[in-house]
Design a protein with these regions (language model features):
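Flexible, glycine-/basic-rich loop-and-beta segments that form/coincide
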Residues: 313-386
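Mobile active-site "lid"/loop adjacent to the S-adenosyl-L-methionine
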Residues: 192-193, 231-259
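Conserved SAM/SAH cofactor-binding pocket of Class I
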Residues: 146-231, 237, 280
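SAM-dependent Rossmann-like transferase core, predominantly class I methyltransferases
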Residues: 100-164, 169-177, 181
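Conserved Class I SAM-dependent methyltransferase catalytic core
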Residues: 252-307
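Long, charge-rich, low-complexity alpha-helical segments
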Residues: 62-110, 150-157, 162-167, 354, ...
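Acidic, low-complexity/disordered tracts enriched in E/D and polar residues
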Residues: 2-65, 104, 129-131, 359-450, ...
């Protein structure tokens, strides 16, 4: 029997799910145990294709046995597993359709299963139990222990809120993680296989303020509105459909665009869409293109922030896509022609935030480049500052703030040869976090930024600058402080 398309039992008794949770807890089947076994620092460093060929030794604890089955994806001898995990473990896992008899001497897992923060998640396997070549399939439920999913999990907002929609939910991991701080969560995906896995994960974790729905994007939640919508859509540009979890059409935007276009109708006032995706920059940058997507659908009532983590040049992407699909030079050239026809200049990967206004005001766009190891808190702070600096009374509040220059800021002074020797050419201020920014600066701006050490108020800095004879006006000074804060040079 082919177990590659097995689905865990999502209609088992609550007693069985509770017993499974107890097994994991008593076995210390935790992130720390996985990291110790693989000698890694985080789950996203697991490389299953390599690890299943490695020998991590005979399991000596129940946690090791569970890790071998569900994370390494290797078979284990039933007697050994029973001695580690207890007499009832095998029958429990069989009832839940999580294991099967591979042969007379070993059992194997039907799924991958692992801890993600405070929940356990089951997904489709990513390797074959018998060591044969692993073949994926169209509606495979993508594992969420790889780096791409880890990035999405990091950006999930955790503040208390009303209902949440996890769109393109796959395993339903976002809905389960956010259920702890949300009134209710909904996991929505288009495939029956994802629905079944999400239902199992919900029951396995004993989380009941969450619902699983099936349909095309927002269709199964028609008429509902949310405080938060989170989505990690299929965004891979493809010539032809590959797998549902990654195929985003020729430009990679077909699903992402619809997620954004239809979001306004499902966001409550003050609600936000968080979308981790790859969007193409064309004649207009990504943030302006996103506003065009919302034209006639709430564009004037939304703020847009796009924080770019990676920028892929089209030639490099075309080469990688050709190699990945085992194509040839003709495929490479066809990719370049396709991007040229669409006017694509680069493929920008990052976090898109769209907020529906809670009250009427002017909308804004912000687009910044972040380091690869970005902190979601910096992105949230950036977006919050853009909102605050457009609020009533902001300028009076600004004068009492004590900004501090970001520790990553550097001042470069360039000289050029001229009459009489070296002459000052210009100043350049650069930073590598929280955003990658480089600006030309005057001596006055360099002097101003040096005043922001976290001990002086903005008002005091203005006074000192005025006393130094800089001759800067109040309005230009405020505008400069706001601009430097927007670029991430200042922290409060």
């Amino acid at each position: 029997m082919d177990h590659s398309r097995s689905i865990p039992n999502d209609t088992a008794s609550e007693a069985d799910y509770a017993q499974l949770r107890a097994l994991f807890e008593s076995s210390s089947f935790t992130l720390q145990a996985i990291c110790r076994r693989f000698n890694i620092s985080k789950l996203a460093e697991v490389d299953p294709l390599r690890n299943r060929l490695s020998d991590f030794g005979v399991p000596t604890t129940a946690a090791d046995g569970l890790i071998q089955l569900f994370v390494e994806g290797k078979p284990i001898e039933p007697g050994l597993f029973t001695s580690l995990a207890g007499l009832e473990a095998i029958s429990l896992l069989e009832r839940l359709n999580l294991i099967y008899s591979l042969n007379e001497t070993s059992i194997a897992a039907t799924v991958a299963l692992y801890p993600i923060e405070h929940v356990y998640i089951a997904s489709d396997r990513y390797n074959s139990a018998d060591g044969s070549q692993f073949e994926g399939f169209d509606d495979i439920v993508y594992p969420c222990l790889f780096e791409t999913s880890a990035r999405f999990i990091r950006i999930l907002p955790r503040a208390s809120c009303g209902p949440v929609l996890d769109l393109c939910s796959g395993t339903g991991v976002a809905a389960l993680l956010m259920a702890r701080s949300s009134e209710h969560t909904y996991a929505a995906d288009i495939t029956e296989r994802c629905r079944r896995f999400a239902l199992f994960n919900q029951s396995m974790n004993g989380i009941y303020n969450s619902s699983v729905v099936i349909g095309d994007l927002y269709q199964p939640v028609a008429g509902l509105t949310f405080d938060r919508i989170v989505v990690h859509p299929p965004y891979q540009p493809v010539f032809r459909h590959q797998q549902i979890f990654n195929s985003g059409g020729l430009d990679g935007e077909q699903i992402t665009r619809r997620c954004v276009e239809e979001s306004y109708a499902h966001l409550r006032p003050g609600g936000r869409l968080y979308c981790l995706a790859q969007i193409t920059a064309r004649e207009q940058p990504v943030d302006q293109r996103v506003r065009q997507w919302l034209a006639g659908k709430g564009a004037a009532d939304c703020d847009i922030g796009f924080y770019i983590t990676k920028r892929h040049e089209i030639e490099l992407f075309a080469a990688k896509a050709t190699l990945t699909t085992k194509g040839n030079e003709l495929d490479f050239r066809e990719w370049l022609r396709a991007f040229a026809r669409m006017g694509v200049r680069s493929l920008d990967y990052g976090l898109l935030i769209v907020e529906r206004h809670a009250a009427p005001r002017e909308p804004f766009n912000v687009c910044l480049k972040t380091p690869d190891a970005w902190d979601p808190a910096d992105l949230e702070a950036s977006f919050a500052f853009e909102i605050e600096c457009r609020s009533a009374g902001f300028e009076s509040r600004l004068w009492g703030r004590k900004p501090r220059l970001t520790p990553t800021a550097k001042l470069e002074v360039e000289h050029g040869i001229g009459p009489g020797g070296w002459q000052l050419s210009h100043y350049r201020i650069i930073q590598s976090g929280p955003f990658d920014v480089k600006i030309q600066a005057s001596q006055g701006l360099a002097q101003l930024l040096a005043l922001f050490d976290g001990t002086r108020t903005v008002e005091r800095c203005f006074q000192e600058l005025t006393e130094s004879g800089a001759g800067v006006g109040r309005r230009p000074f405020v505008d400069t402080v706001v601009a430097m804060a927007s670029e991430g040079f200042l922290r409060w």
